[in-house]
């Protein structure tokens, strides 16, 4: 099964090949994309409003990403030019984790998805490439401040078989 892991990987491959804007099914945009996107944007990274008292307090905080001040980079939204080196790095990191998968190392169920194809390898790969200073990117601390909305759907329907409910 692990449809969420497959979806993660497919999303990275498609966005690498085609570029553009990806939003999760439950997400939306409150403004025209023209007001978000700038011609010079190659890759946009967004963080969570996850500090004490904020809307998504605690979201994206993961023991494997403690070195990132605000936790994981969001991958419910991906904005990239085609053949983005950032997405190439993500694909390589996820491929490595799939090829070397171990339930002991990466876990199973929800944790397995987060650690193998989800925000953990996504954030690790993106952060690693940021530190090379070779490629440009734009960082938006909060996605919602520039129009991206995390939950804009009835999540009881969308999440009926959500990967977070998987135990094996």
Predicted regions and their residues:
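Glycosyltransferase-associated regions of secretory-pathway enzymes
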Residues: 1-8, 23-168
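Small-residue hinge/turn detector
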Residues: 8-20
């Amino acid at each position: 099964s692990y449809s969420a892991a497959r979806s993660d990987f497919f999303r990275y491959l498609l966005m690498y090949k085609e570029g553009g804007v990806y939003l999760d099914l439950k997400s939306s945009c409150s403004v025209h994309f023209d007001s978000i996107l700038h011609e010079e944007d190659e890759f946009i990274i967004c963080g969570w409003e996850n500090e004490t008292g904020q809307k998504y307090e605690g979201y994206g905080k993961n023991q494997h990403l403690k070195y990132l001040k605000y936790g994981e980079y969001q991958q419910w939204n991906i904005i990239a030019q085609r053949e983005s080196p950032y997405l190439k790095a993500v694909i390589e990191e996820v491929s490595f984790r799939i090829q070397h998968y171990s339930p002991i190392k990466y876990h199973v169920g929800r944790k397995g998805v987060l650690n193998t194809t989800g925000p953990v390898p996504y954030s690790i790969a993106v952060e690693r490439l940021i530190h090379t200073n070779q490629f440009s990117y734009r960082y938006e601390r909060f996605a919602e401040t520039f129009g991206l909305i995390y939950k804009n759907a009835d999540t009881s329907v969308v999440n009926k078989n959500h990967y977070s409910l998987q135990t094996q």
